[in-house]
Amino acid sequence: MTVTDDLQLRRCRSADVEAVLELDEWALREAGTDPADVPGSGDLRELPASYREAGGAFVVGTLPEAAADDRLPALGESHLVAAGGFRPTDAGYEDERAVEGAAELHRMRVAPPYQGRGYGRRLLSELEWRARAAGFRLLVATTAARQRSAVAFYPAAGYREVGRSTYGDYELVHFEKEI
């Protein structure tokens, strides 16, 4: 049994919104990013419709109570450990690249004490599978250079760096992968 065997991945539900917002803010702060600096959070407040209606998906990863600790946001009898989604690139924010026929990963988060255990990799594999099933053949991702773990995560998962840009005080790193 591997550490991620207890992870259950499923589509996000409206009832998950508060837990997703809590995880999002926690993970950003731990990575050195002020959540107020990240463009909008309207997509999270309007889950799951904000992803589904745009042609994407938002997925949550939960652990049963016995496999989790009380630092994780509660979701009924389970706890939220990971979350993330994808949308067509033309459904993103002004500062993001629009690549015809591609989807962009958004809000990839793993609870800080659980990072480095394979949960992010499992979530990413699920999102890649769902994006491919939805007809996308290219996934793009953008992260702040100061989020070192994310900058290392994407190349380790087969993404290649395709450029850098600036948004406010943040240097952004752009990745893509054919799926």
Which sequence ranges carry the predicted segments?
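Acetyl-CoA-dependent GNAT
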Residues: 3, 7, 11-112, 124-125, ...
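C-terminal "cap" of GNAT-fold acetyltransferases
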Residues: 3-7, 26, 45, 101, ...
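Conserved glycine-rich acetyl-CoA-binding loop
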Residues: 107-125, 132-134, 139, 145-152, ...
